[in-house]
Each structure stands twice: as C-alpha cells, then as structure tokens.
From Swiss-Prot:
PANTHER family in the record: LARGE RIBOSOMAL SUBUNIT PROTEIN BL27M, RIBOSOMAL PROTEIN L27
Gene3D superfamilies with a match to the protein in the record: 2.40.50.100
Alphabetized UniProt keyword annotations: Ribonucleoprotein, Ribosomal protein
GO biological process: translation
Record Pfam families: Ribosomal_L27 (PF01016)
InterPro entries, A to Z: Ribosomal_bL27, Ribosomal_bL27_CS
Protein name in UniProt: Large ribosomal subunit protein bL27
Signal peptide: none
UniProt gene name: rpmA
Amino acid sequence: MAHKKAGGSTRNGRDSESKRLGVKMYGGQVIKPGNIIVRQRGTEFHAGYGVGMGKDHTLFAKIEGVIKFEKKGEFMRRYVSIVAA
C-alpha cells in the first residue's frame, strides 16, 4: 500500500493588485477634456489652470490644450496646468 503523508499548507502566495498610479499624459502633449493626466495617492501634483481633481486626487483635463508641468509657490509645489492651444 503506497502512502504519502499530506504536505502542510503554505501561508505565502498573496499580493495586492497594482493600482496603476502615475503620470498618464506628459508635458507638451495635446489633451482633451475628461482625459486623465495623473493618478495619485494624495496631492503629489496639484491642479492648476484647466485641470480638475477627483475625490481620489486624480487630475483630469477640463479644457482642450497642451499640458504644462511647473513648480511654483513658496513650497515649490508641482502644478499641472493646461495652456489653450
């Protein structure tokens, strides 16, 4: 009679699904209203002119134009704006 003792179960083998965060459209690119520019957790980038912010801090275009990334203000915050083309 062939017997094999059962192996123990493992406690590994899990990982969370990636959230696909990051910059989706870059400076100089032409963008349309509603297009996503940045997906982020918190305000790594702030919304400038022509850019809206969703409840999960996603930045999206409100107008058509060209994307511009800039640092400004006392704390040199990074802003994303849209320059009308």
